[in-house]
């Protein structure tokens, strides 16, 4: 929609101001999403269940980054090794929101939906420090003295980000526990606390010189651990606001960022975008699932549904703001084109392919269904799908 209305919507608008609005909106949205996603995942269960999510994160994600960097180095010969690595990292995180029908289709095996959902919830947070490290490496490559400053900045970004996240996560968990035990907060105000906590983590880390994104992600993890349960009801406001901001971000992305990108296309950019959404994702997924006896339809399903979205857009903004890369414009063009193609391709195929995959799975008799896909697992709630609107404290239950 943003792409269609872009030329008319931008008529007479200061693009410099618009770019600033896009950056602010996208960064705020990602901070909320990082907090919400991190707080939804039970890390203890993830450690115990050495299954699809752990394989996709521990094996698939690093291989996706490396293969994406290799493809960038081959197609864009002007990029340095560090710049190619940056492009690989920026396009590694997946965005399950772009294929919502996949993780919410009840006929798709729960273990497969869980794998894609958890992968999407954690890989953007994992990639944030990797991106800062790659940017520091690029600066070190081009200027030794400046690179040393970049390394110091990297340590500060991660260190202060973690510190801000830990403090904010513990603080909001303590507030909810204390207030819940004494009935100090009306039930309708509970969802405000995590939203404020995400903002507190981001603001505290940024003020100290750290990464607000790392802080938001860490705050979500710590909040979940300190609270001792899935804060699904408490995150209702974050989920709803995040969904709205996410939609607005993509509309503006199409109007402001994607449109100009389409005017400077090259065959290398198009080929890289196609490879990024196919082989660069599918080969690592197939390797990660080696030995699980997953069926070919399952490997294809997991490999295809790795949409690129919000995190990649914000990471591209970080590259522009935090680095002095000689070819940052090329990196940004590749990212924007890949995300735009992903929005179109995954949006159109999510429903039909989820139904087709479910039909394949259900075509097997109950006693002969594929073992890997049929294994029972605890399902993590997809973003924005709370099951209970009232916090336990408001019902008189312990928090």
Describe each region flagged by the PLM.
Residues 1-398:
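Transmembrane helical cores of multi-pass secondary ion antiporters/exchangers
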């Amino acid at each position: 929609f943003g792409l269609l209305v872009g030329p008319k919507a931008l008529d007479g608008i200061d693009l410099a101001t618009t770019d600033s609005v896009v950056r602010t909106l996208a960064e705020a949205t990602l901070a909320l999403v990082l907090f919400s996603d991190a707080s939804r995942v039970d890390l203890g269960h993830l450690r115990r269940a050495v299954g699809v999510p752990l394989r996709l994160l521990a094996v698939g994600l690093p291989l996706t980054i490396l293969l994406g960097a290799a493809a960038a180095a081959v197609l864009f010969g002007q990029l340095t090794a560090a710049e190619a690595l940056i492009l690989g990292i920026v396009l590694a995180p997946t965005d399950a929101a772009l294929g919502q029908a996949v993780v919410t289709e009840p006929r798709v095996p729960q273990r497969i939906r869980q794998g894609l959902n958890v992968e999407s919830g954690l890989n953007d947070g994992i990639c944030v420090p990797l991106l800062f490290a790659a940017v520091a490496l690029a600066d070190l490559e081009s200027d030794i003295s400046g690179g040393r400053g970049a390394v110091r900045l990297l340590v500060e970004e991660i260190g202060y980000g973690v510190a801000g996240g830990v403090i904010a996560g513990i603080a909001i968990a303590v507030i909810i526990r204390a207030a819940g035990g004494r009935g100090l907060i009306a039930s309708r105000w509970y969802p405000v606390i995590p939203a404020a906590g995400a903002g507190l983590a981001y603001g505290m880390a940024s003020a100290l010189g750290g990464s607000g994104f790392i802080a938001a992600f860490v705050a979500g993890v710590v909040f979940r651990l300190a609270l001792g349960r899935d804060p699904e009801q408490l995150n209702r406001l974050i989920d709803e606001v995040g969904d709205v901001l996410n939609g607005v971000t993509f509309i503006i992305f199409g109007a402001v960022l994607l449109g100009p990108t389409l005017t400077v296309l090259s065959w290398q950019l198009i080929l890289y975008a196609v490879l990024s959404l196919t082989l660069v994702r599918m080969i690592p997924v197939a390797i990660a699932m080696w030995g699980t006896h997953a069926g070919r339809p399952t490997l294809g399903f997991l490999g295809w549904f790795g949409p690129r979205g919000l995190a990649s857009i914000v990471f591209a903004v970080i590259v522009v703001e935090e680095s002095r890369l000689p070819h940052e414009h090329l990196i940004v063009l590749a990212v924007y084109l890949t995300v735009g193609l992903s929005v179109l391709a995954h949006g159109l195929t999510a429903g039909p392919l989820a139904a087709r995959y479910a039909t394949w799975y259900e075509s097997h008799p109950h006693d002969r269904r594929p073992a890997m896909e049929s294994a029972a697992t605890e399902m993590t709630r997809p973003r924005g799908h709370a099951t209970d609107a009232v916090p336990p404290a408001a019902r008189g239950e312990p928090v």
